[in-house]
Swiss-Prot record:
Pathway: Nucleotide-sugar biosynthesis; UDP-N-acetyl-alpha-D-glucosamine biosynthesis; N-acetyl-alpha-D-glucosamine 1-phosphate from alpha-D-glucosamine 6-phosphate (route II): step 2/2; Nucleotide-sugar biosynthesis; UDP-N-acetyl-alpha-D-glucosamine biosynthesis; UDP-N-acetyl-alpha-D-glucosamine from N-acetyl-alpha-D-glucosamine 1-phosphate: step 1/1; Bacterial outer membrane biogenesis; LPS lipid A biosynthesis. The keyword Hydrolase does not apply. Its EC number is 2.7.7.23, 2.3.1.157. The gene is glmU. It catalyses: alpha-D-glucosamine 1-phosphate + acetyl-CoA = N-acetyl-alpha-D-glucosamine 1-phosphate + CoA + H(+); N-acetyl-alpha-D-glucosamine 1-phosphate + UTP + H(+) = UDP-N-acetyl-alpha-D-glucosamine + diphosphate. GO terms for molecular function: glucosamine-1-phosphate N-acetyltransferase activity; magnesium ion binding; UDP-N-acetylglucosamine diphosphorylase activity. This is Bifunctional protein GlmU. In the N-terminal section; belongs to the N-acetylglucosamine-1-phosphate uridyltransferase family. Residues 227-247 are annotated as: Linker. It comes from Chromohalobacter salexigens (strain ATCC BAA-138 / DSM 3043 / CIP 106854 / NCIMB 13768 / 1H11).
């Protein structure tokens, strides 16, 4: 049987007080609606439909390249009206209705719900809450069968005492929805077409309503304002931290730690406070990450030490390297075994050989360093001529003195030595000493000029 997933993402989200559509606000570094789309992909959806309205062009742009069909809800007239915009595109098989601002729903929960659905059964995800707040309530008969769902604003005092709540997540068939949605009425307190009214229609036809519940209420938490967004972010990060702790990762403080992508850790990894991991990050056995470090789309091999306040992006780091503090590794950086990039050093598109050291206050970009190289403080590879980038090639065991400018394209042969304060613009042969600076002049007894009174 086919599966259509419908994601409702047309709301304005006025309480977010933002020009950006609510579903595009980021949770763990990814738009809310993208989390839901990822879940739909895990379910193996035949077709995925995103109902858009407010900020439609922004949503379409953000989701460009994803396998989705867009349906426009020009006027927001309720959830039933939103789903109705997709009717012409739906198959007759199973249909799952999700929400673009409910990002943490799990595929396992939805699979259990979908397993309940056929032409004689409708599926509804419910959750029991101590404080139901503004949620719709599940009304059951004496035999425990669901007879209808009443929205909070339309509920009586007795109905508001019910703690089993509607999550809004519904599983039905396309045939059922095509029959029921055109019959919806807007005669209610909100003046909207409620999707939930289809449950009364199902009951009238003798169609059973099967219910399922999430493993945690966190799965069905929605976002309406910045406070809820922040709370959901922290809940999500707590969950990620607990998983890592269970896997044996040592976190200095699980409450001060963010994963905004995929993080894989080996044995005996230590992560200090305030660290952020974005994209696809791998930390090998025994890696230590110092406080307030950002690592994005990088692989860090076993035994590497990363000191505080370092930024590592798009880098490959081999075993037992040492990075930081206050180091910045930009995309294309590859550090070999036991190499070192120290404080206030920036690298970009650079290969640093085994045991080589760039200890402090340097920029090394578009460069290749062999093994055993020492780069003195204040060394700069001058790689850009205003139009094009050029490479610097440094052989094994080269020693570069402090405050040196290497004007690319330039090559330093193996074992070469560069005197401190030099500006090197021509190749240096292997084993040679190159010094390129003006001769010092000293005037004894020099008296500085004084201002006239």
């Amino acid at each position: 049987m086919t599966l259509d997933v419908v994601i409702l993402a047309a709301g304005q989200g006025t309480r977010m007080r933002s020009a950006k559509p609510k579903v595009l606000h980021a949770l763990a570094g990814k738009p809310l609606v993208s989390h839901v789309l990822d879940t739909a992909e895990q379910l193996g959806a035949t077709r995925t439909h995103v109902v858009i309205g407010h900020g439609a062009e922004q949503v379409e742009t953000e989701l460009d390249g994803r396998d989705v069909r867009f349906a426009l809800q020009a006027e927001q007239k309720g959830t039933g009206h939103a789903v109705a915009q997709t009717l012409d595109e739906l198959g007759d098989g199973k249909v799952l209705i999700l929400y673009g601002d409910v990002p943490l729903i799990r595929a396992e929960t939805l699979t259990a719900l979908l397993d309940e659905v056929d032409e004689r059964r409708l599926g509804l995800l419910t959750v029991t809450l101590d404080d139901p707040g503004g949620y719709g309530r599940i009304v059951r008969d004496a035999e425990g069968r669901v007879t209808r769902i009443v929205e909070h604003k339309d509920a009586s005092e007795a109905e508001r005492g019910i703690t089993e709540c509607n999550t809004g997540i519904v599983a039905a068939t396309g045939t059922q929805l095509k029959r029921w949605l055109p019959q919806l009425s807007a005669e209610n307190a909100q003046g909207e077409y409620y999707l939930t009214d289809i449950f009364a229609m199902a009951a009238a036809e003798g169609i059973e309503v099967a219910t399922a519940s999430p493993a945690s209420a966190l799965e069905v938490e929605g976002v309406n304002n910045r406070s809820q967004m922040a709370a959901l972010e922290r809940a999500y990060q707590r969950d990620r931290a607990e998983r890592l702790l269970t896997e044996g990762v040592a976190l200095a403080d699980p409450a001060r730690f963010d994963v905004r992508g995929r993080l894989q850790c080996g044995h005996d990894v230590f992560i200090d406070v305030g660290c952020v991991f974005e994209g696809d990050v791998t930390l090998g056995d025994g890696v230590s990450v110092g406080p307030y470090t950002l690592i994005r789309d990088s692989h860090v091999a076993a035994g590497t030490v990363i000191e505080a306040h370092s930024i590592i992006e798009g880098a490959e780091v081999a075993e037992q390297a040492h990075i930081g503090p206050f180091a910045r590794l930009r995309p294309g950086t590859r550090l070999a075994r036991q190499s070192k990039v120290g404080n206030f050093v920036e690298t970009k598109n650079a290969e640093v050989g085994e045991g080589s050291k760039i200890n402090h206050l340097s920029y090394v970009g578009d460069a290749s360093l062999g093994g055993g190289v020492n780069i003195g403080a204040g060394t700069i590879t001058c790689n850009y001529d205003g139009a094009n980038k050029h490479r610097t090639e440094i052989g094994d065991d080269v020693f570069v003195g402090s405050n040196t400018a290497l004007v690319a394209p330039v090559a330093l042969g193996a074992g070469a030595t560069i005197g401190a304060g030099s500006t090197i613009s021509r190749d240096v042969e292997a084993g040679a000493l190159a010094v390129a600076r003006t001769r010092q002049t000293t005037r004894a007894g020099w008296k500085r000029p004084r201002k006239s009174s």
